[in-house]
Amino acid sequence: MKKYIEKDFPIGFLSQLAERESWRKEIYRPVYYIHKWWAKRLGSVFRGIVLATCSDESADILKSYYSKNCFSDLTVFDPFMGSGVTVGEAAKLGCRVIGRDINPMSSVIVRASLAKYKVDEINSIFIQIENNIKDKIQSLYKTKLDNGKLTDVLYYFWVKILNCPNCENETDLFKSRIFSKNAVPKKDPSARAVCPGCHGINHTFYDCEKTTCSICKTSYNPQNGNINGGTVSCPHCSYKFKLVEYLKKTDQPLNHKLYAKLVLDEGVKVYEKPNAYDFKVLDQVKSEFELLSSSKKIPFVSIKKGYNTNQILKYNYKSWDQMFSPRQLICIHLLCDEIKQLSDSHSKQLFSCLLSGILEFNNMFCTFKGEGTGAVRHIFAHHILKTEVMPIEANIWGTPKSSGSFSTLYKSRILRSLDYKSNPFELQLKNRKSLKISNINIPLNCDIAGNYSDFRKNGPSVYISHGDSGNTDIENLSVDMVITDPPFFDNVHYSQLADFFYYWLNQILNISDDETTRHEAEVQDTDADKFSEKLCSVFSECNRVLKNEGLLIFTYHHSRHEGWTAVYEAIRKAGFICVQSYPVKAEMSVSVSVQQAKTPIHLDLILVCRKSGNEKAEFDAGNILRTSVEKAKTQITELTRSEIKVSPGDSKVALMGRILCELGKMADMEKEINFLRNVEEEVNPLLSDLIVSQEQKIAYPCDTYPDQLQLFE
């Protein structure tokens, strides 16, 4: 009997859930958010995929979604495990699960997420760490108020500085003199600016173009700074020069100067200029850091060249430790030493992930988001390592009003995750309200096998490993289904970004002798042929371990035609054929990566594949395209009726999915691939017809359709 997903899939229902989940992913699926990972897929969708693949075609999936299930006789394999969404969702449904990823960071994070813990023991460890080093860390984030009272500093504000190559005077690189404003300035127009004369802190408004310093009476335009679009203008001699050219003549990162702080005075936030006490603390930090450096307790690990790291290399950052301030390095070292001493390996992994997780909010590449929101804009806000000229330094231990600190993330990430693991709930929508449905899932306190042999003996229900998924230790024909989310062609190079965390995790956990998580076999290429070849290697291994009646199911989307050709070639050469495709909600519609895309795509395509063989040839090029358009229209209609916005880029995803399924009817791999390579010009007008024919809720419409239909650039 066929599986439900081979016949149908509730794309409207699941996209509605996914839309809601996408806004508060860390609330609705906290187990996958104890640490940063990229391109995390939505748990509600993958629960649906696992459930529809485990269930026969006669099942009532909508009823089963909120019922107790246990598929303990079925084994799921995810060869691109990432943050562990497939592993977790399958485990909740009682499946036996194998997760693997070529990046060692993935296996650390997933093990830490799913392992068994006792909450009271985890709390005891946190209290132990707190008792041992909290006061020491907090002493480095204290300041003295005018009344002589010591208080906590929430954030320090820094600016990069250099000496003008013409007059040699110090020049600060403010992009604007305004350094703090509300995240929604029209709601609260007040702002803070730093005076270019006396460096005092002035009250102003976010759109003000002229203000007078309340201290030294200097008049200035707070909108202006000394750097604009990479060009520096010296305030002393008016000499203009390119920052990138200046950096070529030196071999060190630019220095920073402290210009402001945000403190707590009787629980009230106050912006102040740094005082003598602050510089005394910095002198203490300098002395302690020199001792730490001389003892070589902060190892030098070079930043490797790569698409996502070349930018910071141009700014003369050569090693990962240079991305942190001396104060941050001292505090991180203290936390590392405490966590290293933990005897329980699971607890050590969990607290290592907590420490590693705070690093994205505590480095000199973070900026201030403003009042009225989480204050720290973390280093990966734009999916790249972007050098900032006005960074913010947060309180690493944290206060109740802090953002991204060790103490606050312990509560919001670790404790929330542990609570969810004990009774994983599902999100249900009723009358546009979100409900949590509990007591239907198997708790996520998993016994995790250390090797495949232990897993095969029906002991632990989860087996996690890292390495090339094109070469595994899994038995032939032993897996019931492969469900995964592979990297997309020409997408973010995760390993280049993951090295930022790996530098610290490896010091605590001794993961590997390698200084990088990069691997020659990782499926992350800008070359379509190389991408297809590496993806095919993994899919071929999936074919080997998958039972003959099993299914390979994965999510994918792309705006460029060669991205579709590459993935189809990998599927077919690995011995699979596409039998179904379903467009479904993928990312939050206002996420940075979506908004920055030239052709925004909010949907993923679920591709359902089975092993090829005995296909009957039915070659009619015109019929393939006509059928694909009609089926794509039906799917888009279902989505829009469920109030899911569909962009032109999304329409292409739906159409290409149907084309990939229809192509298999040729029953000739070479003909199929050649047809797909040459069909691009025919797809454009079909896509236009598809959009115009639907009364769609178009996301991010442009002024004219032709501009938005340039989907193959």
Regions found by a protein language model. Name each.
Residues M1-F77, V87, A91-N471, E475, ...:
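Nucleic-acid modification enzymes, centered on SAM-dependent nucleic-acid methyltransferases
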Residues S83:
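Conserved SAM/SAH-binding loop
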Residues N510-S512, G550-Y556:
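Conserved beta-strand signature within the Rossmann-like core of class I S-adenosyl-L-methionine
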Residues V482-I483:
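Hydrophobic beta-strand segment of the Class I
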